[in-house]
C-alpha cells in the first residue's frame, strides 16, 4: 500500500518531542545496528538514520500494521541502510532477535499511543469524538476495549485502571461501569469516568 503524498510528507517530517535527547543518549555511529521497538511514523528513525550516515542496520518493530507505508517511505529515503520491519509486540520480537543472534548497539522504545492512533478517531483512542470502543494497537486482534469494559469483573477492571492507568478512583469507576453496562462508545466511558471522579472529589470535600 502506498501512502498518499500528504501522508508521505507527514511521515518524513514528523519530529519527536525529545529528538535531541534521544540522539545524545544513544550516540549512534555509522556501522551500528539500531533496534527501534516502536517505529510508528518513523520520526526517530529519520534522526537515527541520519546519524548512521548510510552505513548500518535499522531494525524497526511495531505491532500496528498501519506503520508499513511509513516504513516503506523511510526505506526509500534511506536505501543505503540495511532495513527491516518486524511486526509484533516488541518484547516477543526482541526475544526472537536475541535467539537468532542479532546484537544491537542501541535499542529505542517510545512507549504509549502515538498520533497514528489518536489522529484516527475510528480507532477509539481519542475521546474527542464519540466512536466505538476499540483501542486495538493491532486491528487484527479480536479483543477490543468494549470487550474488556463489558466482560471483565469489577475487580479486574479496577486492577487494570490502577496498574496501567495509575487511576486514583479505580474502584469506584469500575463499580459504576459494571452498573452502567453495556458501554459501547468512547463518550459513554468518558461520562462514567467524569461522573465518578466528580462524585469522589465532592465526597472528599464534604
Where are these regions (language model features)?
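S-adenosyl-L-methionine-dependent methyltransferase catalytic core, i.e., the SAM/SAH-binding region
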Residues: 1-203
Amino acid at each position: 500500500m502506498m501512502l498518499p503524498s500528504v501522508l508521505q510528507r507527514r511521515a518524513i517530517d514528523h519530529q519527536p518531542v525529545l529528538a535531541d535527547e534521544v540522539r545524545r543518549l544513544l550516540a549512534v555511529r555509522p556501522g551500528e545496528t539500531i533496534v527501534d521497538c516502536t517505529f510508528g511514523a518513523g520520526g526517530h528513525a529519520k534522526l537515527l538514520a541520519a546519524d548512521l550516515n548510510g552505513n548500518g542496520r535499522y531494525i524497526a518493530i511495531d505491532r500496528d500494521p498501519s506503520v508499513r507505508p511509513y516504513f516503506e517511505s523511510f526505506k526509500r529515503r534511506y536505501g543505503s541502510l540495511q532495513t527491516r520491519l518486524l511486526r509484533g509486540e516488541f518484547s516477543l520480537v526482541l526475544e526472537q532477535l536475541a535467539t537468532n543472534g542479532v546484537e544491537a548497539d542501541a535499542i529505542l522504545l517510545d512507549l504509549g499511543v502515538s498520533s497514528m492512533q489518536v489522529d484516527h478517531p475510528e480507532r477509539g483512542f481519542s475521546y474527542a469524538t464519540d466512536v466505538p470502543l476499540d483501542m486495538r494497537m493491532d486491528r487484527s486482534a479480536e479483543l477490543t476495549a468494549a470487550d474488556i469494559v463489558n466482560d471483565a469483573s469489577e475487580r479486574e477492571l479496577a486492577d487494570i485502571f490502577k496498574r496501567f492507568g495509575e487511576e486514583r478512583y479505580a474502584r469506584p469507576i469500575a463499580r459504576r461501569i459494571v452498573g452502567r453496562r453495556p458501554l459501547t462508545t468512547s463518550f459513554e466511558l468518558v461520562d462514567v469516568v467524569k461522573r465518578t471522579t466528580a462524585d469522589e472529589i465532592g465526597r472528599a470535600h464534604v
